[in-house]
Curated annotation (Swiss-Prot):
The gene is rpl32. This is Large ribosomal subunit protein bL32c. It comes from Euglena longa (Euglenophycean alga). It is found in: Plastid. Belongs to the bacterial ribosomal protein bL32 family. One of its GO terms (biological process) is translation. It comes from the Eukaryota. The keyword Ribonucleoprotein applies. The lineage of its organism: Eukaryota, Discoba, Euglenozoa, Euglenida, Spirocuta. It holds the Pfam family Ribosomal_L32p. Its main location: plastid. Keywords: Plastid, Ribonucleoprotein, Ribosomal protein. SUPFAM superfamilies: Zn-binding ribosomal proteins (SSF57829). The keyword Ribonucleoprotein applies. InterPro entries: Ribosomal_bL32 (IPR002677), Ribosomal_zn-bd (IPR011332).
Length: 50
């Protein structure tokens, strides 16, 4: 028989959301940095398949 889940506390859900957002921001910063380096022609640090 199905049992309802326990309610997650606000602090726990907020900490999970902030952890997720921190990971997303890190990936966004990496993507922006990679895009800038590719647009300015600094390809020495990256290997691209042609």
């Amino acid at each position: 028989m199905a049992v309802p889940k326990k309610k997650m506390s606000h602090s726990k859900s907020n900490s999970r959301k902030s952890n997720w957002k921190r990971k997303v921001i890190k990936k966004i910063n990496f993507a922006v940095t990679l895009g800038k380096s590719l647009s300015f022609g600094k390809l020495s640090k990256f290997y691209l398949d042609d």
